[in-house]
Amino acid sequence: THGTTYGGNLLASVVAEAVLDVVNQPEVLAGVQERHQWFRNRLEKIGQQYGVFKEIRGLGLLLGCVMSESWAGRAGEIMKAAHDEGAMVLIAGPDVLRLAPSLVITEEETRMGLDALERAVVKLATQSKAA
């Protein structure tokens, strides 16, 4: 069978256990839930305002923004435009924009990143109307 190069490494296992000890603390989990709401609220607002997302899904800070029918297949375009605006987002196929921010991202960093994402959506929406 195939495994990973470092999968059985004792050091990697100890580090993973230490990370889980920190991440599973109640105050860390509460912070993740709070940050989840920051993202979800703003992404839903962007989706409604520009008709770009039909659904925001995910748990914690791993979020997927499913493209609406009018934006179908354009997740890659949004990813590139967001990068041009200074936000790092990912895709999960042609119809899902994926966000996976740090568990300790600040409210200001969240606002800045989502402002950049919104600017990207506005630029693409403007280009689509002009075409």
Go through the PLM ranges and name each one.
Residues 1-131:
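Conserved N-terminal phosphate-binding loop of PLP-dependent enzymes in the Aspartate aminotransferase
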